[in-house]
C-alpha cells in the first residue's frame, strides 16, 4: 500500500489473471466471481477494475477509490509502501462499508446539482 486509501483494499482484493478476453459471457462471469470470492475489489488483467458492495452506491464508491489508488501507484511507482502493521490499523477505518458509501455521497454532491 502506498496511500491511506489503498489500505481499504490491501487485505480485500483479488486478481483475475486469466487470458479470458470475453468477460461478458456467463462462463467468464462465473470465473471472475470465483476469483473475486468475498473480496470487494477484483483487478481484471487486460480489462480493469471490478468492485462490489452491499449497495450500488457502495460499489461505485469503492470503484472510485480503487481508481484513485491505481492512479497513485502509477504516479509513484517507487513510493515507500505502508507496513502491513500500519495498513492493518488504517484498514480498520478505511475498509468498512460506510467508506464506500461515503465516497459515493461525496461524488454525488460534487457532480450533481441539488
Language-model-derived ranges and their functions:
Residues 1-114:
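Glycine-rich flexible loops
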Amino acid at each position: 500500500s502506498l496511500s491511506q486509501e489503498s489500505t481499504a483494499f490491501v487485505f480485500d482484493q483479488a486478481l483475475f489473471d486469466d487470458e479470458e478476453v470475453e468477460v461478458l459471457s456467463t462462463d467468464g462471469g462465473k470465473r471472475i466471481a470465483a476469483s473475486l470470492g468475498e473480496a470487494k475489489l477484483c483487478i481484471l488483467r487486460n480489462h480493469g477494475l471490478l468492485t462490489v458492495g452491499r449497495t450500488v452506491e457502495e460499489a461505485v464508491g469503492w470503484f472510485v477509490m480503487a481508481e484513485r489508488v491505481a492512479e497513485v501507484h502509477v504516479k509513484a511507482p517507487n513510493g515507500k509502501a505502508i507496513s502491513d502493521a500500519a495498513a492493518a490499523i488504517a484498514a480498520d477505518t478505511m475498509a468498512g462499508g460506510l467508506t464506500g458509501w461515503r465516497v459515493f455521497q461525496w461524488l454525488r454532491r460534487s457532480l450533481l446539482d441539488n
